[in-house]
Swiss-Prot record:
GO terms for biological process: queuosine biosynthetic process; tRNA wobble guanine modification. NCBIfam families: PRK00147.1, queA. It catalyses: 7-aminomethyl-7-carbaguanosine(34) in tRNA + S-adenosyl-L-methionine = epoxyqueuosine(34) in tRNA + adenine + L-methionine + 2 H(+). Synthesizes oQ from preQ1 in a single S-adenosylmethionine-requiring step. The ribosyl moiety of AdoMet is transferred and isomerized to the epoxycyclopentane residue of oQ. It comes from Prochlorococcus marinus subsp. pastoris (strain CCMP1986 / NIES-2087 / MED4). GO terms for molecular function: S-adenosylmethionine:tRNA ribosyltransferase-isomerase activity. Its EC number is 2.4.99.17. The keyword Transferase applies. This is S-adenosylmethionine:tRNA ribosyltransferase-isomerase. GO terms for cellular component: cytoplasm. Belongs to the QueA family. It is found in: Cytoplasm. Pfam families: Queuosine_synth (PF02547).
Amino acid sequence: MNFEIHNEEIDHKLEAYDYILDETLIANKPSKVRHESRLMIVRDSSLEEDFTTNKYTKNLLDELRKGDLVVVNDTKVMKARLKVELENGKLVELLVLEKADQSTWLCLARPAKKLKINSQLNLKSSLAKDIKLHISGTDKETGGRFIKFPENINDLISMNNLLDIYGETPLPPYIKSAEEESFHENSYQTEYASNPGAVAAPTAGLHLSKSLISNLKKKGILVMPITLHVGYGTFKPIDQEDLSNLKLHKEWVRVSSEVVEEIKRVKKTDRRVIAIGTTSVRALESCYSYEMGDLIPIDKYVDLVIKPGYKFKVVDGLLTNFHLPKSSLLLLVSAMIGRERLLNLYKKAIREKFRFFSYGDAMYISPDSFLVKK
């Protein structure tokens, strides 16, 4: 089968990105050692052995060359899940997404129908005094609520400080875990997380242990950070069947001039840019200015959509997890190696009992596996 031929009509249909997964393969906790998670390595589709399944994330070291640039997302997951009390005493859950204006923040709510506009909420903690919140409006795009916090909660730093006291780790709903909150505070965070702002983890980075990062550097592989605060744009379910005009919610990205200059140096040689996670891909590809025909540093919100037919300007390889059906992340990886091939690889991963989603195993998309060779 020739996986380099896109069927654009099929590729633009959401249903084409569906697959069946046994719930027992959804990982509810990570590997005991980060770099001991299983790794599927995807190679050139023309090879007889075009993928390998008997590897571990620590074997990524063998796939990379001296001089390669590995880019990680250093965002830090905030304890963005809040349990708040309604005026009638019943509890609802908020997920703080982003600042809307001054001290008003956009939050997803569960169940949302119980949050009436202009009503009050009570935020409690055994560690601090109660805080009164006010519901000021509804967001049409997300279905979330605009919540007015105290006036001093007006930036990421102040919000993160509040969440450290009142919040909980925002685990995805498909993770059914009996572990204590303290376990997830560590395990649902990368080793290099340093910039609070995410409401979900850049999960490919969960596979990188300190020792693996150290070994990469010892081999002469550069490891540099970018920041993309993982938010609604990454995990929002796609609600349209026709993907031709798909739009994603914006996410804040920072790529420094140092990273951009190193990428330019890499591109002048036979070295490669390897992204750790789809969020790193989205950040790096957002650096390309079509007006200037060049890479530029960025510090802004981006809403780049990567789906089949997209031509990669920056990224040569990718370490990623196994993603949910019909997700924007599945579209992104399909843009690299083709939708049909990716879904066939997922079938093989399912047969071999790979673990899926945030706490699951990993896939390495090697540079020679890209549909369009660099």
